[in-house]
Amino acid sequence: TGNDFVYNGDKPVVVDFWATWCGPCMRLLPKMEELAEKYKGKVMFYKVNADKEKDLCKHFGVQALPTLFFIPVGGKPIIEVGATPEKYMQIIEEQLLK
């Protein structure tokens, strides 16, 4: 499952699993773009379209949208389900960039 791996990249990563039909996902889009700009060069941001990447969603155990993985270098992911952008900057600051 998505929690059983250790990431070995050189920058922390945020992975956003989303879909065009998901209202909360679409409302989250501008906030995620804002965060990607704010942390440019420090954190890598990826978006995964759940409709196009069903196997990837299954592999990572994604069952609801939006689901975000906050992955520190050399650490296990912090998984957030639902559109709660007020928590995201705190997770990035306290968990990914510590």
Question: What role is predicted for each listed range?
Answer:
Residues 1-13:
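A short beta-strand-turn-helix
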Residues 26-39:
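Typically the conserved alpha-helix immediately C-terminal to a functionally engaged Cys/Sec
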